[in-house]
Amino acid sequence: MLSNLMSWHITLPIALAAAVIGYLFGSIPFGLILTRAAGLGDVRSIGSGNIGATNVLRTGNRKLAAATLLLDALKASAAAWIVGYFLGEEAAIIAGFFAFIGHLFPVWIGFKGGKGVATYIGTLLGVAPIMVVLFAAVWLAVAFTTRYSSLSALVAMLVIPVALLILGNEKVAAVMAIMTVISYWKHKANISRLMGGTETKIGAKG
């Protein structure tokens, strides 16, 4: 298993190309673009200051939030699919990872991006699509029992690398595990509120 994890055959130039392409795809700030296009101003000036779908939802425009979620996921999937088609499976994994990094730290807006849940899902869709079903199932189960959106995502992101490892997909498991750790760091405020019992529940007002 360890030998499979370490046996990457991709060359450095291809890996770098995949990383750059993935990052550029991921760094497109759809939440900001859509809210400005809709005349809602700068989404970074409200709520958490985040450019992701959850903060876009705080504008009161659910369709815009859904569009942001979809596009933030698809930019990672597209990066993985396009790079994978031309440069191979390992390059697709790298592109998906760097699309995730690009979303979290977009160069165009001072490296202040989202928390990565949508691009995490998008990367899964690009490199291990069946895992999206597991992610959704775990998210829904936790959301139904706790009504915490953040906790649902955090638990789902913890389950995915373990499931991939069990299924023998060590390379993707390793990359998704790294992404999980990074996203947990980006969710540190949510984790603090969850531990303190002050995290907002799904459907809560105010």
Curated annotation (Swiss-Prot):
Probably interacts with PlsX. It comes from the Bacteria. GO terms for biological process: phospholipid biosynthetic process. The keyword Lipid metabolism applies. It is found in: Cell inner membrane. Belongs to the PlsY family. It is a multi-pass membrane protein. It catalyses: an acyl phosphate + sn-glycerol 3-phosphate = a 1-acyl-sn-glycero-3-phosphate + phosphate. It is an enzyme of class 2 (transferase). The chain crosses the membrane at residues 14-34, 67-87, 91-111, 124-144, 148-168. This is Glycerol-3-phosphate acyltransferase. NCBIfam families: glycerol-3-phosphate 1-O-acyltransferase PlsY (TIGR00023). Keywords: Cell inner membrane, Cell membrane, Lipid biosynthesis, Lipid metabolism, Membrane, Phospholipid biosynthesis, Phospholipid metabolism, Transferase, Transmembrane, Transmembrane helix. Its EC number is 2.3.1.275. The keyword Cell membrane applies. SMART domains: G3P_acyltransf (SM01207). GO terms for cellular component: plasma membrane. Pathway: Lipid metabolism; phospholipid metabolism. GO terms for molecular function: acyl-phosphate glycerol-3-phosphate acyltransferase activity. Catalyzes the transfer of an acyl group from acyl-phosphate (acyl-PO(4)) to glycerol-3-phosphate (G3P) to form lysophosphatidic acid (LPA). This enzyme utilizes acyl-phosphate as fatty acyl donor, but not acyl-CoA or acyl-ACP.
